[in-house]
């Protein structure tokens, strides 16, 4: 399948490259993934055949980011900032609002907004846990959206459940798309009445007992009970 050549993607907070892999699967050219966890580099580059840049996003300058995009390409900037400050687990185990506010990780969303403002990519995408929507009274997310709109972006967002799109798992995520050109119509559910089950997804795998590894695939194993 032909690559979509007009656009180039840079993936901030890329980790091992799940979002990058999705863009590559949809035929986009991903120029580079950026993360400050260097242990992700091998998996990222091996699985995606894309360059990994070991860099703290808070220290990435606008000029450095612009140089990551090939010349004469339309820029897509994506980022999934760490979700721990906004997660249900953190809410349940940390009721101290002041302590939550001091967690520097949530401020990474502001660093992301700074880079968007400074480089003006044509398209922006962001994904995080649904709790981000109401974190700190909604201020963090609302600030992010307001800065995008102030910079001329049409912003669309919503909370989506992976099971509604053919994934055999209940996993809700807040997804945001922003464009300089027009408002995105977010994809409606495709599997509302015909969810894919775990049995359908992995039922073809051979049975193994607890504590065993598959002879054919060392990544397929069952923990000892």
What are these regions (language model features)?
Residues 2-10, 14-28, 147-150, 173-225:
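S-adenosyl-L-methionine-dependent DNA methyltransferase catalytic core
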